[in-house]
Structure formats: structure tokens, C-alpha cells
Amino acid sequence: MANYGTKIDEKWQKFWDENEVYKFNPENSGKKLYTLEMFSYPSGAQLHAGHWFNYGPTDSWARLKRMQGYNVFQPMGFDAFGLPAENYAIKTGIHPQDSTLKNIETMEKQLKSMGAMFNWENEVVTCLPDYYKWTQWLFLKLYEKGLAYRKKAPVNWCPSCNTVLANEQVVDGVCERCSTEVTKKDLTQWFFKITEYGDELLDKLDGLDWPEKTKSMQKHWIGRSYGAEVTFKVKDSDLKFDVFTTRVDTLNGVTYVVLAPENKLVDELTIPEYKAAVEEYKEAAAKQSEIERQSVSKEKTGVFTGSYAINPINGKVVPIWISDYVLATYGTGCVMAVPAHDERDFAFATKFNLPIERVITDKENTNPDLPYCEYGVLVNSGKFDGLTTDEAKKKIVEELEKDELGAMKKNFRLRDWLVSRQRYWGAPIPVIYCDDCGIVPVPEKDLPVKLPYNVEFTPDGKSPLGKCEDFVNTTCPHCGKPAKREADTLDTFVCSSFYYLRYVDNKNDDAPFDSEKVNKMLPVDKYVGGPEHACMHLLYARFITKALRDMGYLNFDEPFLSLTHQGLILGPDGLKMSKSKGNTISPDDYIKEYGADVFRMYLMFGFGYTEGGAWSDDGIKSVGKFVDRIERILENCRNIINSNESTKDSIDSAEKELNFWKHNTIKGVTEDGDKMQFNTAIARLMELTNALNKYTQENIKNANFLKETIVDFIKLLAPFAPHFAEEQWSLLGNNSTIFNEKWPEFNPAALVKDEVEIAIQINGKIKAKIMVASNLDEEGIKAASLENETIKENTEGKTIVKVIVIKGRLVNIVVK
């Protein structure tokens, strides 16, 4: 009867806690290893299998590294502000603060029942004043450096969540949280100037040990391009506007220009005759998402403003249109249209019967079909005819620069980070508005600006804090006159943009962190979390790290040196888990039945860690049986060790065979575990389990050698089944934790066998197997094979045509 279960888990969790086994000591001599899992949102009542898949296997990796001599720092906390927690509170009718703190309490218990070696003394909870004081401090520091600013801008608005969304929170035109179609709305908002770091955010990516797909996503999101900014003057007007283009070589082919419907110039450019049509078009465009507007398959629409622009390179007059395929948020919000050499412009010109003029041909001058979008040679471009695209770009910009009508320009797809939210459950923005003094940052000594409890937070499109008179009404820190507080709260991603720094010095009341401590502990060596954060949290954290570095607080460039994305655990039906589908997996139920280590090992053995897959009850049952089998075999081994019967001191073939499997397993588990290939690491342990079981069947056994083997076996097992391994370790008579033991090292010599098994085939069919010396040459192997009695019988009376030897594996005898 197996003994392992939750009682064993509880026993060793108590031992670890009472003996402070995992308490981090920064003075330890071991090489530091900052291991971090993305902290959890406490928006639901409990942890699910996905949390476990993030935290459990990563903890096993950290345990392995600890036993290899690393001084592991593995803190845990909660990303407690934001829409998920607020929506949960609205759904349940419980105040966000009460529901969030209760959920955290539950999740803490669940995380502790996992048996992970989290450094709970370094815990952070972002919704507590002792944390968001430093979120507000960060805002003030960015404001001081000109990296936080306020402006009126068209923003993404979710009518269901009743709040603004950052560009990164809009997926395929809908809100990533509730899937409601996102619209545009003009609001005065706070932004962080992440674009200031566009070049470095892009250039430093290649040096990071991150998944290539994630790096590619960030590169695309940042979207650096090189081109020219060209100034078009409006005919019969003092107005002018700039366009950004990567194909200034086609400037002579411009036959019209297009402005985004939201462009501020549109109202000034539109003549009365076209006013009604333009206004109607603007309203329709505002209801569409940017994704929809940029769709290649979408039919092109637009309206003429009645005004004309002057092409700065040739003086030609071209009409000014507005169209929704031009976005106010990209470039200048104005596009020079060259229909002969751009597919979207070509479709637009074809529909509205606008001129199409070729200005680029191929090098053979064959006049390829239009639109021709490749590089080539200029035609119909006056003095620039005959130049290649690259030559023309340089010459045309030089010509424009003479009249101050153009210049080389670098552009980014990346937009500044919108951080204002019209919701309650977030860190208040530490700003005061005074009629006399304008925008006044809250003095640092007055932080934190506390979030009031008694607030009506049901979303109605307005900031809930604006309805709380006690909060909003204050006095100006400069002049002492009545003033108003900012009623918006900060995007929760601001809280998570620096939490990895606060962990190191979480009890510091005077600063967000001690720079000396942080610079010693950071960057994070291994970061684990979902790939959905590629263009949000992971990008924002990089920006904040660089900004704090430039302020003198940090001496490193990047927050996370190595990044791993865990896969997704699906329901038993192969679909994403959700309560509505009834396919969710509750870890608590399985832990009660099997124990935390079986649950952990199933997650590591049943799935590739970066891939995930569908949950299987049969799978966890199999792992449970495997642990039971280990328990029986180890008990048998202990009985053999403690018995004086049928033992020996010599190392013979059976011991050499077991020693081979031991060192083969040490090598495999070390290599696979280090690469987070947990499923193959556990498969290696299964091989050693089989070898151990086989050895116990020997008539005479070497008890001392057997003990050495199971000592190493339990050490290898420990990261993957920590409670179970501690119990087995103690049953060997040890009083200290196994996690203070040194990780086994493999001996290459042990992997060289004295003898190897050779399969002998006759005409491709195996007829016998023999053991030969591992260093035997081909002639010796051939001779030994032909001397085998079974082979003699099968070749008698036949002609041996040839004998093929594959050393160390097989012999094939061809007969006729």
C-alpha cells in the first residue's frame, strides 16, 4: 500500500517553513539565480491548472539549480489591480478590495500547498498602498524627465468595459478582455513616451535569450522604418502638411493625397460644398477598428475635401481626399498616393477614377503590369529619369532639402503608451489640477495618494473617482488654493512594469528599492510566463528598466535575460478551459487524491513544457502508479541494504549495468532539466527505475553500491517530486533537507560499457543476440557471431555471401 499523499506534503511543508529552508540570504556564497514566474491576477477565486503549469515546473527547474550550487531567489506576489479584479467584484457584488484580498489569501494557501520554494518574505501585492506608493513615484519620475505627458487624442474605447484601451489591448478590432468591438473617442489622457526608446528597444532584442517568435512580435510592433518626410503645401492657402514615405523615389507619381478622417486639418481643408459628405464619412470611420480599416480585402472608400495640394518636387496640383485606410496614429496621418506603385492606392484610384502615372519601371524597361511595387529605375520623373530607386531617394531628398520641403526621416509603428484608465480599481494618478498653477505633481512626501474605499465604481464611461468629492477636492501644493485631483487611475501594466525590482527590497519604506541591492540581484536570470504579454508587459518592463537606468537608479539595460513561455493546458476535450464549457480542471481535487508531487510530475511528464496539451485523467493515474512503484522499489532497496544476507563487495557485470544507467540518467536529467525539457527528464528517471528494479532481482547484491545508487536516484528525483523525495531521503536516515545536497555529476567513463549487446540478423531478420567486449574490432565481432550456435544452425547448408557489421549495434549475415 502506497504511503505518499497529502499528509506527506503537509509534513515537509511544515519542516521547510519551520527551518526556513528556502529563505533567501543575499550573502550566501553561491552564484545568484533570480528565477521569476509572472505573478498572478487574483481576479478569480482560485488557482487553476494553468497557474500550476507556470509555477510548478519552473519551481522544479529552480530546485535543480539550487542543488547545482546556485543561490536561488524566487519571490511571489499578486498583480492585484486592474479590470479583471474589478469586473469580478462587479459580478459578485463584493468590493474589489475585499474580494481581491480574500482571493489572494486563498491563492496563497494553494501556492503553499504546491510546495514551491517561493520566498514569501519578499511578497508584493500591487493593490496595497505600500506598493502603489512606488507606482505613483515612478509616474512622478517619468513626469520629471518629460517621459509622462498629457494630451488630447483619439483613443481606443471599449463601450462594454467603459474605459480606454492601449493599442496593445485591442486584438483584431475588439477588446482583449470582453471581445466587444472597440471604437474611437477623443479624450485628454496621460501617456508615457515609450517611443523615446524605440531604437534601443529594437536594437537590444537580438542579445536576449528569448523565443524568436516573441522577439519578432516586438520587432514588428516597434516597426522601425526609414524614409523621408515630405511637405505638401495646400493650394491657395497658408496650410501645409507632412507625409512620411519609405518610397520618396515615387514622388513624381503622386496623383492625389489622402488624410486620415481624424486628422485635425480635415475641417480646415474641407470646402462648404463637401462639408456634409466629409462629416458623414468621419462619423462612419470612427465606428471602425484600425484592423478593419487596414484590411487588404476591404473595399476602399473615401471623400474628396474640395481642396488641392502642390507636389513639392514637380509643382503639380493634386486633389486632397480623406479615407479610412489612412490612420491618424501612424506616421503623420497623411499619405501621398502613388497608385502606379502601391496596391491600396491603385485600388482607390481605380474606384474613384483618379490618374495613375508610372514613374518606376524594371531594369529591362519592359513596363511591367501596374501596380508595380518593386524597386527599379525611374521614368517620367524629369531630371531623375534613369536613376535607380536607391540613387533617386538620395537625390530627391537633397532637392527637397534645398527648399526646406523634405528630409530623411525615421518612423516607428510604436505609439506612446496610453496609461489613463476611467476605472476605479487602479493606482490613482498623482497629479493635481490648479486653475492658477496648472498641472501640479503631488509632492513625493505626500505619497501614496490613497484609493478611497467608498466609491460607486459601476462603469458608466466616467472616472469613478471623479464622483467622489472627498477624493477629488483638495488644495494646490504650490499656492494652497482649492484644486482638483486627477480622477483617472493608472493602467495596471504600470504596476507590473517594475515589480521585479521591488521584490528585492520589498520592505523599504523610503524608496522603491535600494539601487545597490537591485543592481546586485538583477537582471532576472530566468523569467517564465505566457506569450500573450509579448507586446505589453514584456515591452513596458523593458522601457521602464531603460528609463530608470537613464535616471541613475539601475546599471543594467534589460530586465529579463532569459525568457520561457509555458504552453497552454487544455480541457480533456482539447478545448481551452472555461467554466461555460464545463471543462476546467481544479488542482485541489487532484492533489487531495494523488498528492501535490503527482500533480506536478504529471504536468511535467504529460506535456512538452512550451507546448502544453489536453488534460488526461488516465495520464495522471499513470504518474500516480509510477510514484507508487518508486516507493515500493526504494522500500525493497532499503530492506536489501539493511539485510546482511546475499550481499557482496565486488563490482561485477550487474553493478556495471546499473552504474551505466545511473550515470546515463544523471547526464540526461541534468541536460534535459536545464533546458526545461521536463518530460524527457522524467522519462530518464523511469529508465533508472527499471534498472533499479532489475538489479534488486539479482541473487547476490552489493549493498553499499546499491545505497550509493539510490542516494543519487532520490537526488535526481527531488526537483520533480520534492515532498516525496524528502520522505524517501529521511527514510535513509538523513535528518537534513535533501535540497541542501549537491546535485550528482555523471562520470563519462561509466557510460563506456565493458560489454555491449549485439543483434545478429540473417537476411535482415534477427535470429540471436550476443554480448561482446565493447572494444572488440569488426573481425572479432564477425567471428563471435558466426560461432553462435543458433547462427550455425540457421546457416548450415547455405552460402554466406557477406557479413555486414555495424559496430556496437548489429551484424547482418547475408546468405543464399
Curated annotation (Swiss-Prot):
It catalyses: tRNA(Leu) + L-leucine + ATP = L-leucyl-tRNA(Leu) + AMP + diphosphate. Belongs to the class-I aminoacyl-tRNA synthetase family. It is an enzyme of class 6 (ligase). One of its GO terms (cellular component) is cytosol. The keyword Methyltransferase does not apply. SUPFAM superfamilies: Anticodon-binding domain of a subclass of class I aminoacyl-tRNA synthetases, Nucleotidylyl transferase, ValRS/IleRS/LeuRS editing domain. This is Leucine--tRNA ligase. It comes from the Bacteria. Its EC number is 6.1.1.4. Keywords: Aminoacyl-tRNA synthetase, ATP-binding, Cytoplasm, Ligase, Nucleotide-binding, Protein biosynthesis. It is found in: Cytoplasm. GO terms for biological process: leucyl-tRNA aminoacylation. A motif ('HIGH' region) lies at residues 40-51. Its main location: cytoplasm. It comes from Clostridium beijerinckii (strain ATCC 51743 / NCIMB 8052). One of its GO terms (molecular function) is aminoacyl-tRNA deacylase activity. ATP binds at residue 579. Transmembrane segments: none annotated. CDD domains: Anticodon_Ia_Leu_BEm, LeuRS_core. Gene3D superfamilies: 3.10.20.590, HUPs, Isoleucyl-tRNA Synthetase, Domain 1. A motif ('KMSKS' region) lies at residues 576-580.
